[in-house]
Amino acid sequence: MPRKSSRLTFAVLATGAGVFSMLQSLIAPALPTVQHALHTSQSTATWVMTAYLLSASVFTPILGRVGDLVGKKRTLVAVLLAVLAGCLVAALAPNIGVLIIARVVQGIGGALFPLSFGIIRDEFDASRVPGSISNLSAVIAAGGGVGMVAAGPIVTALDYRWLFWFPVAIVAVTTLIAVRYVPESPSRADGRVNWLGAVLLSGWLVALLLPLSQAGTWGWGSVRVVGLFSAAVVLFAAWLLSEARSSSPLIDLKVMRLPSVWTTNTAALLFGAGMYAIWSFLPGFVQTPSSAGYGFGASVTASGLLMLPMLLAMFVSGVLSGRLEPVVGAKTLLTTGAALGAIACAILALWHDQQWQIALVAGIFGLGIGLAFASMANLIVGSVPPEQTGAATGMNANIRTIGGSIGAAVTSVLVTGRLQPSGLPYGSGYTHGFTLLAVLLLGAALAALMVPRRSGRGGGKTVGGSGSVLLKAEEEASVMAPGALN
C-alpha cells in the first residue's frame, strides 16, 4: 500500500478505535449526573456501564472472526454504523432503559480493535506493521484517558448528552471515509461462522461478567451470583467441546495453546485486572472529601486533570514503543510495562496524601499502559496466521476485559468491606486494594517473562504468510516447558 494511502487508512482505524475506547470511560464520571437527569436509581444507572461491557465482550471475538471470513473492511463499516446508531440513540434517550439499549449497541464497537489490527497486518508493508500496531495501541490506550479527562468539562459546560453527540459527528465522518478509502482485505479465512460456538461463547462470557459487575449489589453468596458462576463453568466447558469438534471453530484452540499466545493472554488477564481497577477507583479516591481521612474532595473536572499525566504518558510511551520494539523486543516492553504498573500501585499504597503523588503515580502507570498495550497486540499479531488475526486479537482484548472485571470486583470488596459512619470507605480499604493491584501487576510482569523470546523481538518478521510457519514451530514447542524457549 502506498504510504499516503496507508496513512489515511491508519487515521480512519485510529479514529474509530479511539472513539470506542473513549466511550468506554467517558460515561463513568458522569453516572451521578445521568442518574439524576433520568430519575433512576444508582443500581440501575450502573447498567449503563455493565451493558456496554457485556456487549463488547460478546461481539469483539465474534465479529473479529466474521471479519476474517467475509472481509475486514465490510465488517468494519458495519461496526462503525452500529456505533453511530448507538451514540445517536443514547444522545436522544428519553429514559434509562433506552440509554442502556443504546449502550448495548455501542458495545458492538469492541470489534473495531481486532478488525483494525487485522487490516494493518493485511494492508501495510511488513516492516511497518509493528510500529503501526504500536501507534494504534497508543491511541486506544489514550482514548480511555481522554474519556476520564474530558467527561467533567463536557458535562459542566454543556450536558451529559454531549458525551454522545460529539462521537456521533466523529464516527459519521469516519464511516464515510472508511467506505471510500479503506481497502478490502485480500486475506480470507476458509469455513463459516460456528454459530453454536458463538452462542456458547456469549453465554459463558455473560454468565461470568454479569455477577462480577453486580455482586456488590446482589451479594456474593446470593442465588443469582452462585447460579450464574455455575452456569459460566458449564457453558465454558460446552464451548470448549464445541470448538474442539468444529471444522470451522470460532476461536482456534490450537492457536490459543501456542506458548506466545497463552503467556501473552495470561499477562493480559492480570494487567487488565490492575488497569481497569485503577481507572475505576482512583478517581473516586481523589473525589472523596478529605474529612474521611484521605482524598482531596476534588470535582469531576479536577480529578480528571489529575489523571492527565496518565493520558499523556500512555500516548507517548505507546508511540515510542513502535521504535523500541525492533530493538528490545515486545516481550521486554510488556514486562517493563507491567512492572511500571506494579511500581505505580505500590507507591500509591504507601503514599497518597498529596496531589502531586497521585499525578506522579498516574504518569508512571500511563507509561506502563502504553508499553503493555502496544506489545500485547504485537505479540499476538506476530504469532498467529493472518486468517486468525481478528479472532486472536479479539480474544486477547476480551481476556483483558475479563481480568478488568475480576480486578474491579475484588478491589471493590476490599475498598467497601468496612465503611465509616458517613458511609465512605476507610482509607485502609484503598491501601489494601492498591496493594493487591501491585501484586496482580507483578504477576503480569512474571507472565510476560514466560513469553517465548522468538516472538518477542521483531514482531514484523512474523507477519504476512510466515504466521503459519511460526504456528507450526510453536505447536512443536508447546510440548516443552513454557520457559524452554526463553
Predicted regions and their residues:
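Cytoplasmic helix-loop-helix junction between adjacent transmembrane helices
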Residues: 105-138
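Hydrophobic transmembrane-helix bundles of small-molecule transporters
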Residues: 156-268, 272-274, 279-281, 294, ...
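Membrane-interface helix termini in secondary transporters
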Residues: 33, 61-65, 69, 153, ...
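Conserved MFS/SLC helix-loop-helix module at the cytosolic interface between two early adjacent transmembrane helices
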Residues: 58-96
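Paired small-residue
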Residues: 82, 86-89, 97-105, 356-364
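12-transmembrane solute porter fold
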Residues: 6-31, 40-42, 46-51, 137, ...
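Structural signature of the two symmetry-related core transmembrane helices
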Residues: 74-89, 168, 332-346
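Helix-breaking motifs and short loop linkers at transmembrane-helix boundaries and internal kinks
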Residues: 37-39, 71, 92-97, 158-159, ...
